[in-house]
């Protein structure tokens, strides 16, 4: 104990000495050679400083975006889902519907899916729980993805700042909504995502990717927009054409829900084909449920939940031994 006290005292003394030295020799003041003169109007709105790329009066409509965040020459795609899509492969997202336990999430993320469809539209967990799951196994085989609840700045930026590499946005009904979702997904100049930090920038997540996260994420993010309503069907061509939309999801359940027709009926299939036609014309990837993996032109899928995966796994493991429990005549287990 006495030794620890002496060590602590020595550290304090060294700290005080360093502080005293700094006060005796203060650092030179920071220089701002292009700053406006104190208390004066610099006229910056009307005229740029010497050497500026953007000349003339300030106008956002004609602003030439700078090169500070360009990806380095020769940068390669590091998101395996984006790469597989670009190569023409089929990608599948396994759904984590209700789990908040990182161990369950990581088991799903290493089970063989391309990405994890973390469900936030129909689940009440918070973003803190999601961020904790994602940072537990960031280098799992399946990259973190999420279906957000709606297309707004707060929802999508929570997802991205936590490390999402696949963003699924539901119920896109118009070109304006498609652009809104795109804007919050991408950094400028394509979008309006704020550069505010978050665990996505950490070295334990994507901070160490080749070329830098801020510089390369626009080329690596996957944005999937869902058409689920009659209004969305009417605007399908315009939705699919929005730059930055990677794929369009034909929502098998809600297109039935909003149309009033069951899968297989002519009216239902017409709705699905409207999404198909718009997506193919736009040169985008077409997504649907895993049951449609053999349907023409569908190359992106949502698979079942972690609960369904557990049930399937147990059934496969037990085989003929499944559901062969003894049946007591009495007690709580009597049937």
Language-model features, listed with the residues they occupy:
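Positively charged n-region of N-terminal signal peptides that target proteins for export
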Residues: 1-4
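Bacterial N-terminal signal peptides
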Residues: 7-16
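Expand to "…catalyze enediolate/carbanion chemistry for C-C bond making/breaking, isomerization
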Residues: 21-335
